[in-house]
Structure formats: structure tokens, C-alpha cells
Amino acid sequence: MPDDRSDLREAADELDAAREEAADAEVADRLESLAERVREMTETQRRPDHGQLDRLTHDIREVEAQLDGEAVAAAGSALAHVRAYRETVEGV
């Protein structure tokens, strides 16, 4: 199966957009960390597994609850991209 991680790259970009819109510095730092984590997933030879993607989804949702306005929309888009990628991962 081809390994197209474009959805993960899009998710990282959306997390960056959410970070730029975040009013709280701590939340912005968490978004930056999440974006970096997603980028690392795009650069490793091994595909992320369902467990990693589930934890990532949980962490994005947790931060999303602390956002408002455009930042919420960007975080929601990031979640959609992670879910789309997860559908391509074999297993569970």
C-alpha cells in the first residue's frame, strides 16, 4: 500500500494556523508541540499506527476545547485530516 502522508502534512499546517490564532500562550505552545509531533510522523520511515493516531486525536481534541473562533476551525480541520489518514492505516 502506498504511503501518502499528505493528510498528516495538512494536519500539521492546520495546527500551525490554530497556534497563530490562539489567544493563550500555553495553548499556543501545545499546538506548536502537536504540529511538530505530526511533522515527525511524516518524516519517519515507519507509518504511525492506530495507537499513535488515537493519542494524537485525543490530544488535539483536548487542546481544541480551549480554543475559540478561527483556532477552533483550524483544529477541527487538523482532526479531520488525521482521521482521513487513519482510514488508510491497516489494522484495527
Predicted regions, residues:
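Acidic, polar-rich N-terminal leader regions of halophilic archaeal proteins
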Residues: M1-V92
